[in-house]
Amino acid sequence: APVAEVQRILRLYRERYAGFNVRHFCQIARREHGLTFSYTLVKMALQGAGLVAKRRPRGRHRRRREPRPCYGELVHLDGSRHAWLALVPGVMQTMLVIVDDATKQVLYAQLVEGGESTAAIMTALREVLTTFGLPGALYTDRAGWAVSTPTSGSAPDRTKLTQVGRALVRLGIEHILGFSPQARGRSERANGTLQGRLVNELRVAGIRTPAAANRYLRERFIPDFNATFGRTPADPTSAFVPVGAHDLEQ
């Protein structure tokens, strides 16, 4: 590669994209700056300049659960509290993310006021149900909005439904509870990837408010994320069931 072009890559990374991983940097640089070099060449240039660390080979992965075959058969809902707005240091926000199990597509991702409140969860679910339909099942952790737990660390009381639980029963959506971080893997991996990418993109875009971040998520980030990480389900049949606005008002 011409030395001048390699220097351009290094300068671009130093001045605008420091902190991005190599793959993310390549995608953004191709889209925004017309970069044409291969991932391997860019990685070697950045590593050679000491701008990114060489990654150790990964150990053997634990066998992961096979995804559901149909789009809409199972969706995951997870909240992540994090300093999403790097230009507003010290301020934490909660992001709610809903991910389809079969396709890995993000169906909903927004920063919400007040953390994982029942109102925020209901808003997120309503948007997904209105846009996509009723999923077969919803996978969540054992947060207070999801399930009644008499004492800390005790088993959930499935006979005492929360407001969200009652809504799921009424709509015929199975509610699956995760009992460990490993069990919630798919949504938490999506959140981890979101953290690694979104924080950097919001910083580069100069975004300082939750409203602007949510607009960026809807208009730019989620479509790009799904195009990059989404996959074709094993069964092309959609399991989402259309739902009318009247049904959600019940």
Describe the residue ranges of each PLM region:
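Basic, flexible linker segments flanking DNA-binding modules
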Residues: 1-83, 152-155, 159, 238-246
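Generic alpha-helical secondary-structure signal
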Residues: 12, 28, 45, 107, ...
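Short Gly/charged-rich anion-binding patches and loops
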Residues: 24, 41, 124, 162-163, ...
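Short alpha-helical functional segments enriched in proximate histidine and acidic residues
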Residues: 32, 128, 224, 228
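RNase H-like DDE/DDD metal-dependent nuclease/strand-transfer catalytic core used by mobile genetic elements
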Residues: 36, 70-95, 101-213
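Active-site-proximal acidic segments at structured loop/helix or strand boundaries
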Residues: 194-250
